[in-house]
UniProtKB/Swiss-Prot annotation:
Gene Ontology biological-process entries: isoleucine biosynthetic process; L-valine biosynthetic process
Binding site for Mg(2+): D80, D122, K123, E448
Stored PANTHER family: D-XYLONATE DEHYDRATASE, D-XYLONATE DEHYDRATASE YAGF-RELATED
UniProt signal peptide: none
Catalytic activity: (2R)-2,3-dihydroxy-3-methylbutanoate = 3-methyl-2-oxobutanoate + H2O; (2R,3R)-2,3-dihydroxy-3-methylpentanoate = (S)-3-methyl-2-oxopentanoate + H2O
Sites where the protein binds [2Fe-2S] cluster: C121, C194
Pathway of action: Amino-acid biosynthesis; L-isoleucine biosynthesis; L-isoleucine from 2-oxobutanoate: step 3/4; Amino-acid biosynthesis; L-valine biosynthesis; L-valine from pyruvate: step 3/4
Cofactor notes: Binds 1 [2Fe-2S] cluster per subunit. This cluster acts as a Lewis acid cofactor.
Name the UniProt record assigns to this protein: Dihydroxy-acid dehydratase
Active site: S474
């Protein structure tokens, strides 16, 4: 039986195509082998990606040994930490769409038979998965792996969150320049995705839970022999399943796989960005999946692992040592029906077979169900008159005293205004900070709010101030921070109608985000209201703002106008 790449290499009419392929070094024998795409994301400026060029070389060698013909291509990548707190963050979420489009373009333009994806950080992982789902060929993911936690001289573990929060302490005069410099130099000690349960590691963990990656993908450290061995196995597996209809990506990433991903997300208190990305991934997979389904999963899954930033002493390397994703899945599967164990993985095993025999090796890192941090998941979906279409909060990172909090609104119409206000002392205990016009359309690009949230924590206001935004948060954010408020202010959402001094309430147990203003008053405020429009000079961001949906739909690009 033929394979997809026969379209470009078989028959007399493809002589010109073969001629071009021979120019790249192919021989007669290669035209009888499967053509394997390698979507690499080597980018020098990203700590999790600067070494991926070597990983691509290793993967190509392994594919050749396994009987395939590798064709490597690259995607762009944005480092959210470096783009944070300035106009660069406008491009982070839109880059997900460019990455997805580039995967679809390269794979379909050249009729490749299978795909090996080598992502690592932030938007690159979901962007690759979205594009691969459109192509729907057998696909294996192997990320670059997480970095080690940093260590202070006394052995205290630190990470990127420590550095961001230290800025707030320095602004208050609670930390010297020398102390800040020591943290700066030690927070990110190696290559890899940042060491906590931030967005990159969350998405790599979820790829493992969905079965598109091999066991260990989410937790084995970067730049180690273990990670290299994992990459070699993934490359070989891409050749083994090339052309095998059973392993087409949409047969792996189905409703059961997406459910299992959210189970692990809830059990480990992943980044709130995972909600945005899983909604988009489900759409590309053709799976009906929304915020209500996510909340239903959260209600059934205990939160059994707290990882930085929720618990600063525990990092991804500790989760790996404690048994990794298989141990987490095995533990939550003890509550019957929670894990869909019949779901197929790229190795040919079911999830149930993959986790059989897994065990928790350190119960201080992964708790048994009986000692869960909470009986429900580490993420929650909120609704209410301030978020009729939903909002998301990382409950794993909220202090107990802030799970129900009412504060007086102090409103900012951009992240930059908010940072200036916080640094300038405008935000006081008892305030509920509202940052609006930062949604997918209004930003545009739905900036991450790590800078303002870190300033709030670093200034010691974490148990006295809450924050709500139509933007989103870094996985490194902690505190009573509600994001993805939908509809966003730029499309006339209620967030745009809030005024300074209004009483705003977050109630995690009630799953509610509300403003204590009568409906009649909100209606009066809406009369004559026009959302603010920011001047957008970039042609790409203009197109993005015109076509993007709001966060409740995954901030995907609309294809029907």
């Amino acid at each position: 039986m033929g394979v997809r790449s026969d379209t470009i290499k078989k028959g007399f009419e493809r002589a010109p195509h073969r001629s071009l392929l021979r120019a790249t070094g192919l021989t007669d024998a290669d035209f009888d082998k499967p053509f394997i795409g390698i979507a690499n994301s080597h980018v020098d400026i990203i700590p999790g990606h600067f070494f991926l060029q070597e990983y691509g070389r290793i993967a190509k060698d392994e594919i050749r040994k396994a009987g395939g013909v590798p064709f490597e291509f690259n995607t762009i990548g944005v480092d959210d930490g470096i783009a944070m707190g300035h106009a660069g963050m406008l491009y982070s979420l839109p880059s997900r769409e460019l990455i997805a489009d580039s995967i679809e373009t390269m794979m379909n333009a050249h009729s490749l038979d299978a795909l090996l994806c080598i992502p690592n950080c932030d938007k690159i992982v979901p962007g690759m998965l979205m594009g691969a789902l459109r192509v729907d060929v057998p696909t294996v993911f192997c990320s670059g792996g997480p970095m080690k936690a940093g260590r202070m001289a006394d052995g205290t573990a630190i990470d990127l969150t420590t550095a961001f929060e230290a800025v707030g302490k320095r602004a208050l005069g609670q930390m010297s320049d020398a102390e800040l410099y020591e943290i700066e130099c030690k927070a990110c000690p190696s290559g890899g995705s940042c060491s906590g349960m931030f967005t990159a590691n969350s998405m790599n963990v979820l790829c493992e839970a969905m079965g598109v990656a091999l066991p260990g993908n989410g937790t084995a450290l970067a730049l180690t022999p273990e990670r290299e061995a994992l990459l070699r196995r993934a490359a070989r597996r891409a050749v083994e399943i090339a052309g095998d209809e059973r392993f087409r990506l949409r047969r792996i990433v189905n409703a059961d796989a997406i459910h299992n991903a959210m189970v692990v997300d809830m059990a480990m208190g992943g980044s709130s960005n995972t909600v945005l990305h899983m909604l988009a991934i489900a759409r590309e997979a053709g799976v009906e999946f929304g915020l209500r389904q996510i909340e239903a999963v959260a209600a059934k899954v205990g939160h059994i692992a707290k990882i930085a930033p929720s618990l600063s002493t525990v990092h991804i390397e500790d989760v790996h040592r404690a048994g990794g994703v298989p141990a987490v899945l095995h533990e939550v599967a003890r509550r019957g029906g929670v894990v869909r164990e019949d779901a197929l993985t790229v190795t040919g095993e079911t999830v149930g077979e993959r986790i059989r025999g897994a065990e928790i090796k350190d119960r201080s890192v992964i708790h048994p169900l009986e000692e869960a941090y909470s009986a429900v998941g580490g993420l929650a979906v909120l609704f209410g008159n301030l978020a009729p279409e939903g909002a998301v909060v990382k409950t794993a990172g909220i202090q107990p005293s802030m799970r129900k909090f009412t504060g007086r609104a102090i409103c900012f119409d951009s992240q930059e205004e908010a940072i200036a206000g916080i640094m300038g002392g405008k935000v006081k205990p008892g305030h509920f900070v509202v940052i609006r016009y930062e949604g997918p359309r209004g930003g545009p690009g739905m900036q991450e709010m790590l800078a303002p949230t870190s300033l709030i924590m670093g200034m010691g206001l974490g148990e006295q101030v809450a924050l709500a935004t139509d933007g989103r948060f870094s996985g490194a954010t902690r505190g009573a921070c509600v994001g993805h408020v939908s509809p966003e202010a730029a499309e006339g959402g209620p967030l745009a109608l809030v005024q300074d001094g209004d009483a705003v309430t977050i109630d995690v147990e009630a799953r509610a985000l509300t403003v204590d203003v009568p409906d009649a008053e909100l209606a009066r405020r809406r009369e004559g209201f026009r959302p603010k429009r920011k001047e957008i000079r970039s042609s790409w961001l203009k197109r993005y703002a015109l076509l993007v949906s709001n966060a409740s739909a995954g901030a995907v690009m609309k294809t029907e106008l």
